[in-house]
Amino acid sequence: MRKLINSYRFGAIEIGGKRYTTDVVIFPDRVLDGWWRKEGHRLCVEDLSKVLNADPRPEVLVVGTGYSGLVKLSGEVEEALKDRGIRLITQPTKEACQTFNRILESGQRVVAALHLTC
């Protein structure tokens, strides 16, 4: 079942009718809550291991960089995604939620990794 994002505000998100208050990774069929990054506001390859090893592989990864956009990506993340043919979109989380829903509804395999605060 596809998991559309119903709403987002600083520190909270509703996905498929369920509310989450920790950072999340959203696959089309499931939500991984409690997503923790090794370096807080810096996204590293190991933070995305479940995305990079997903089967089927996503076509697009949407990264929500936080309410104010403070999360930054390491160059290794961009390279790892490119090597796997995964298109990367980074946006502040509010815009990333809208982008995820739009891409999901278009039928593409999309995953979102969303930081809910900062």
Across the structure, where does each feature detected by a protein language model lie?
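Short active-site-adjacent helix-start/loop capping segments
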Residues: 34, 69-73, 99
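Mid-chain, well-packed structural core segment of small domains
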Residues: 55-91
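Alpha-helix C-cap/termination motif
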Residues: 54-55, 106
